[in-house]
């Protein structure tokens, strides 16, 4: 039996052990795990991202199980081979030199102007992501000043997928 490892959190799925919590009895082979299954520890990586770390015949190696889809199989798009960017073209991109620059021209207020209540920071206990109430999170749709308690209960960590309940108050030292 083989073992497969999540490249983000190093969770290992061992076919011989299975994962009863996920509904896979011991001996469940990798090909019977649903394609939409994702890592039970970090919820970031899908099945196709896992790497084979040990095969059943005692050979050890790290091999990605990810395979790129054939462009002709991508439905509803007009992708051609010419549309795919070659990795070498990335080397020609200019780099931004931000070393020593003040990226925040003005510091965000550290307390609410109306109530005077200080803004707090919350940290994900799974990955260390910090949600700062003063800054909000524009990418997630939270404007600066959005209190953590005002974030919907079904919100998840943008970095690892952990639930809102996995955040604790962050105290700066």
From Swiss-Prot:
Chief place of localization: cytoplasm
Pathway: Hydrocarbon metabolism; alkane degradation
Names of required cofactors: Fe(3+)
Cellular component annotations (GO), alphabetically ordered: cytoplasm
InterPro entries noted in UniProt: Rubredoxin-like_dom, Rubredoxin_dom, Rubredoxin_ET, Rubredoxin_Fe_BS
Pfam family, one: Rubredoxin
Residues that bind Fe cation 2: 124, 127, 157, 160
GO molecular function: electron transfer activity; iron ion binding
GO BP of this protein: alkane catabolic process
Cofactor note: Binds 2 Fe(3+) ions per subunit.
UniProt superkingdom: Bacteria
Location in the cell: Cytoplasm
Domain Rubredoxin-like: residue ranges: 2-53, 119-170
Up-regulation conditions: Induced by AlkS and n-alkanes.
Keyword annotations: Cytoplasm, Electron transport, Iron, Metal-binding, Plasmid, Repeat, Transport
Residues that hold Fe cation 1 according to the record: 6, 9, 39, 42
Further comment: Unlike other rubredoxins, this rubredoxin is unique in that it contains two binding sites for iron. It is most probably the product of a gene duplication event. The 2Fe form of the rubredoxin is a physiological form but it is less stable than the readily isolated 1Fe form. Both domains can form productive electron transfer complexes with rubredoxin reductase and accept electrons from the enzyme bound FAD.
Family under the similarity heading: Belongs to the rubredoxin family.
Known role: Involved in the hydrocarbon hydroxylating system, which transfers electrons from NADH to rubredoxin reductase and then through rubredoxin to alkane 1 monooxygenase.
Name under which the protein is recorded: Rubredoxin-2
Name of the gene encoding the protein in the UniProt record: alkG
């Amino acid at each position: 039996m083989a073992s497969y490892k999540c490249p983000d959190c190093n969770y290992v799925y061992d076919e011989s052990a299975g994962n009863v919590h996920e509904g896979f009895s011991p001996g469940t082979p990798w090909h019977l795990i649903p394609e939409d299954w994702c890592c039970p520890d970090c919820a970031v990586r899908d099945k196709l991202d896992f790497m084979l770390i040990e095969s059943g015949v005692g050979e050890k190696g790290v091999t990605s199980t990810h395979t790129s889809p054939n462009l002709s199989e991508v439905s509803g798009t007009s992708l051609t081979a010419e549309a795919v960017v070659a990795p070498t073209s990335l080397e020609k991109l200019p780099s931004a030199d931000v070393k020593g620059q003040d990226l925040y021209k003005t510091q965000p207020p550290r307390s609410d102007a109306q109530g005077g209540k200080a803004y707090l920071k919350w940290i994900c206990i799974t990955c260390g992501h910090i949600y700062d109430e003063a800054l909000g999170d524009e990418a997630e749709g939270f404007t600066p000043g959005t209190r953590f308690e005002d974030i919907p209960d079904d919100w998840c960590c943008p970095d690892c997928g952990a639930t809102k309940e996995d955040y604790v108050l962050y105290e700066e030292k």
